[in-house]
Structures are given as structure tokens and as C-alpha cells.
């Protein structure tokens, strides 16, 4: 039997018995970010969040925006989108597990298709790592 990669193990976990963390836990975890930054969300009240949605964004520096977006959607609307993450996230010991625990999956076309097939809301930043690490002049 072939040995599965850590990313494959995490994907199996994410699609197996994924149980979302409590909204309160995510909200507490993001408290330092909310204290430092003041994110503003516009137009979400016009969405029918009883149906799956695809949230697409551009990353801010160091990718802190993803957690703030998840926190807001989950605590205010009860929606925890599943994030499509760069492959690197799932190679970092401990971090890959944390991303998976909060609904993240490796950003592959197959995983995106599976989330859509399951009727999940999805959060994706198409610019990925390239966008997170861009210089001010880019």
C-alpha cells in the first residue's frame, strides 16, 4: 500500500467527518486581529446565505484577512466557508492541521469541485502566495 502524503491525509480528514469549530472559538482567536484592524464588510445583507456562496478576494499582506472574513461570516451569519488554501499551508507541521480544523482544504480543482458538489460555501483567494508576498510596488 502506498504511503499517503500529509496533504492527502488532511484532505481525507476535511472531507470525512469535518465538524466546524464553534463560532465563539474562532471569534476569540481573531480578537487580536480585530483589535488591530477594523475590517468593514459591505453588501453581505443582500446575499442569500441560506444557499452556498463563492467568496473571492484579494489577499492583504501576510494573509490576515482570511481569518477576519471567516470570523465575520461565521459569527454574524452562521456561515463558515471552506477555504481553498495554498499547498504550502498543508506542508507546515501544526499549521496544516489548524487550517484543516477551520475548514481549509488544499486549493486543487478536485477539492473545489468536491466542495461545490457537497453544497459548501467556499472562500478563495486566486492570487495565493504570490499575492500575499507582493511588494508595495507590485
Question: Language-model segments: what does each one mean?
Answer:
Residues 1-72, 77-110:
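Membrane-anchoring hydrophobic helices of lipid-metabolizing enzymes
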Residues 51-56, 115-138:
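Conserved Motif II region of HX4D acyltransferases
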Amino acid at each position: 500500500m502506498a504511503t499517503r502524503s500529509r496533504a492527502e491525509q488532511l484532505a481525507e480528514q476535511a472531507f470525512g467527518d469535518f465538524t466546524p469549530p464553534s463560532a465563539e472559538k474562532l471569534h476569540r482567536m481573531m480578537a487580536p486581529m480585530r483589535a488591530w484592524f477594523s475590517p468593514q464588510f459591505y453588501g453581505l445583507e443582500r446575499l442569500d446565505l441560506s444557499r452556498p456562496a463563492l467568496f473571492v478576494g484579494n489577499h492583504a499582506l501576510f494573509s490576515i484577512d482570511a481569518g477576519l472574513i471567516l470570523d465575520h461570516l461565521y459569527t454574524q451569519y452562521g456561515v463558515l466557508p471552506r477555504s481553498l488554501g495554498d499547498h504550502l499551508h498543508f506542508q507546515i507541521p501544526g499549521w496544516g492541521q489548524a487550517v484543516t480544523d477551520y475548514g481549509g482544504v488544499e486549493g486543487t480543482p478536485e477539492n473545489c469541485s468536491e466542495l461545490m458538489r457537497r453544497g459548501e460555501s467556499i472562500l478563495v483567494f486566486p492570487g495565493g502566495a504570490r499575492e500575499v508576498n507582493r511588494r508595495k510596488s507590485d
